[in-house]
Amino acid sequence: VQSMDKLKAIAEKSGLKQFVVKTPENSTESILQQTALNYMKAADMLETFGVRLLLHNEAGDIQTKIAGKTAYEHLLDLCMGKVGAQVDVGWVQFGGEDPAAFLERNAARVQSVHHKDFGAGREPIDVPVGTGNVDLAACFRFAQSRDIPQLVDQEHFDSDVPGELQ
């Protein structure tokens, strides 16, 4: 309860409308079920002061499959609509899925799109957004057509970041 009071104070002071959490490191069925219960409880509490809880993905929860779905999608299913999706398209791509198709498949629950881009290869090497292997134009169109908030994770700074975002 104390932590929820702190989150409420932060949200009220800053105008935040979303808090983002991630999937657990070990995506087993039992861990995901317990995580879903915890996240739904937190989402219910956050909702009382107008804040939505979102789930962010990593590559591992896209690569891991449970019941024919990614562990990320399975956890969202277990949360029964109480937790929205913040899809990191770079990690979706690196996890082996097509980001645009993944967004479309999960359109009803995507509340935020997190743009990140990686170069080709087996390692997730951050590159300037728009210069890597993610079809960011399709991801931008998806979010813009639905008025979904977007954020750009630009960790590669030795170039013209504003120019690259155009």
Regions of interest found by a model, annotated:
Residues Q2-G84:
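Active-site acidic/histidine proton-transfer and metal-coordination neighborhood
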Residues V1, T23-N26, V51, E58-G60, ...:
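Active-site beta-loop-alpha junctions enriched in small/polar residues
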Residues E12-G15, I66-G84, W91-Q166:
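Histidine-acidic metal/acid-base catalytic patches
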